[in-house]
């Protein structure tokens, strides 16, 4: 690989690099591979029926785009497949892999205007399969919708923070953008399908973006600034109201329950004749009737039992001093009232 003269010579350094993402990838030129490719390579991918109309409309643009890199593209509407091939003029050995990714993205409903960006050197793609991460369909639909958010707000915020184009389609999530952003998108998608809300990862990315602006914190640990969320999911399994104690294990089988004949043998009723059995039943019946009559009499006589009265308390009696009346004061009061009436 070599650079243009305008780019200047590359510095070959063996020293460790602090930020590998900041390194500029040298561009691959036609002069680096003057002999071209030895063999023809081709990749094909199938597309669903509902993409046929769109692909038919944009296919001339696809052919024009790959022709700039000396590739050939074919669309088979009968088989439902897209094919990209190298030609004798193709000099970039990796461009066929990039074009394969482009047709894969287009098959996953990514528009051509976005899919053609993957042909650039600093742009990659990632198709994340999420269909087998959740067993129940209801949970899968709910978590996939959580990734999109209301009116696509969550998906838009992920795109802004990672500088990637993200599309949720069926059982896959297609991401297109710089390689660092693709790692972040994959982490967010996988954690969302594992029941971690994407807003937590979005908040962490926003904090990291602000911390990057401060050069003093470049070599420090950022974990103290990032929010820590605890899982508050409580087991929703209902416990039984009355728990039965577990019986002690015994190697012997349980005892056979007593039959009616066994009970009669234990009480001696089995050996009684018919008349004796009837006499015994009559005796038991008369005992029960006597007990019921006794309870009924007690219930009837309950209304005629006089209630218990409390003894008169001594505190209610007024002392002898309070019963005395001042006669002189009463006479004076009456005379005063008579004078007022006369006047």
From Swiss-Prot:
Residues 272-341 form a coiled coil. GO terms for molecular function: RNA binding. Keywords: Coiled coil, Developmental protein, Nucleus, Ribonucleoprotein, Ribosome biogenesis, RNA-binding, rRNA processing. Residues 272-303, 318-331 have a biased composition (Basic and acidic residues). Residues 230-246, 333-343 have a biased composition (Basic residues). GO terms for cellular component: nucleolus; nucleoplasm; small-subunit processome. GO terms for biological process: rRNA processing. Residues 230-343 are annotated as: Disordered. Its main location: nucleus. Residues 126-194 form the KH domain. InterPro entries: KH_dom, KH_dom_type_1_sf, KRR1-like_KH1, KRR1-like_KH1_euk, KRR1-like_KH2, KRR1-like_KH2_euk, rRNA_assembly_KRR1. It is found in: Nucleus, Nucleolus. It comes from the Eukaryota. Belongs to the KRR1 family. Monomer. Component of the ribosomal small subunit (SSU) processome. Required for 40S ribosome biogenesis. Involved in nucleolar processing of pre-18S ribosomal RNA and ribosome assembly. Binds to RNA. Required for female germline development, cell viability during eye development and for survival of dividing cells and epithelial cells during early wing disk development. This is KRR1 small subunit processome component homolog. It comes from Drosophila virilis. The gene is dbe.
């Amino acid at each position: 690989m070599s650079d243009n003269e305008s780019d200047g010579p590359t510095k070959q350094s063996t020293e460790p690099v602090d930020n590998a993402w900041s390194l500029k990838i040298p561009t691959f030129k036609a002069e680096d591979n003057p002999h071209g490719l030895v063999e023809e390579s081709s990749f094909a991918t199938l597309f669903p029926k509902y993409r046929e109309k769109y692909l038919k409309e944009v296919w001339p643009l696809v052919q024009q785009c790959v022709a700039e890199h000396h590739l050939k593209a074919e669309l088979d509407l009968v088989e439902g497949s897209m094919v990209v091939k190298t030609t004798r003029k193709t000099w970039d050995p990796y461009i066929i892999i990039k074009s394969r990714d482009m047709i894969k993205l287009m098959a996953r409903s990514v528009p051509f205007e976005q899919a053609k960006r993957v042909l650039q050197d600093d742009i990659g793609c990632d198709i994340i399969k999420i269909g087998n991460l959740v067993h129940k369909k209801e949970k899968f639909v709910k978590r996939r919708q959580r990734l999109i958010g209301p009116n696509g707000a969550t998906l838009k915020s992920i795109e802004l923070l990672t500088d990637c184009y993200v599309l949720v389609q069926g059982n896959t999530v297609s991401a297109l953008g710089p390689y660092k952003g693709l790692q972040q998108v994959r982490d967010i998608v996988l954690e969302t399908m594992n029941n971690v809300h994407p807003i937590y990862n979005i908040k962490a990315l926003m904090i990291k973006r602000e911390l990057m602006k401060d050069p003093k914190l470049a070599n420090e640990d950022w974990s103290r600034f990032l929010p820590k969320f605890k899982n508050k999911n409580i087991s929703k399994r209902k416990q039984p109201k009355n728990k039965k104690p577990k019986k002690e294990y015994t190697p012997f089988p349980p005892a056979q329950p007593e039959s009616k004949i066994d009970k009669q043998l234990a009480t001696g009723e089995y050996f009684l004749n018919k008349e004796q059995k009837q006499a015994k039943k009559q005796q038991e019946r008369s005992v029960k009737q006597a007990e019921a009559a006794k309870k009924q009499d007690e219930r009837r006589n309950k209304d005629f039992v006089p209630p218990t009265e409390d003894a008169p308390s001594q505190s209610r009696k007024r002392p002898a001093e309070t019963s005395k009346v001042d006669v002189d004061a009463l006479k004076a009061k009456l005379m005063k009232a008579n004078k007022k009436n006369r006047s």
